[in-house]
Design a protein with these regions (language model features):
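Conserved Switch II/interswitch segment of TRAFAC-class P-loop GTPases
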Residues: 1-16, 26-30, 39-47
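Generic structural signal for well-ordered alpha-helices
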Residues: 19-20
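Conserved P-loop small GTPase signature centered on TRAFAC-class small GTPases
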Residues: 28-121
Length: 121
């Protein structure tokens, strides 16, 4: 998930760098959503238009939406849409769960205690 502040153009400009870094370290099939945050602000405060955000997302193959955490608008959707896209990739065989790396959750996923008796999870 890449999030920028629609009232601060610098945060939008940084999205290209952040995306490049994420793709360099992640799976090529990675699902990314671009979220323009603070959509509750007035149009006069806006520094990045919705069309600009959508064009960037289209150009880079990203999902897109604008949200307002303050108004709780589209916040859930920012998480649900990528999850649905990942589910679709798994369902149609584009990716297989065994091919993915990342955080493992479930039995046996906790780190073992080191010699000092400390463990991390």
């Amino acid at each position: 998930m890449l999030v920028y502040d629609i009232s601060r153009r610098a945060t939008f400009r940084n999205c290209k760098t952040w995306l490049t870094e994420a793709r360099a370290c992640g799976n090529p099939q990675m699902v990314v959503i671009l979220v323009g945050n603070k959509s509750d602000l007035s149009e006069s405060t806006r520094a990045v238009s919705e069309a600009e955000g959508r064009a960037f997302a289209d150009e880079h193959g990203l999902l897109f939406l604008e949200a307002s955490a303050k108004q709780r608008k589209h916040v859930d959707e920012a998480f649900v849409r990528p999850a649905e896209a990942i589910h679709g990739l798994l369902a149609n065989g584009t990716i297989e769960a065994g091919d993915l790396s990342g955080v493992k959750i479930g039995p046996g996923s906790r780190a073992r205690a080191d010699a000092g008796g400390k463990a991390c999870c």
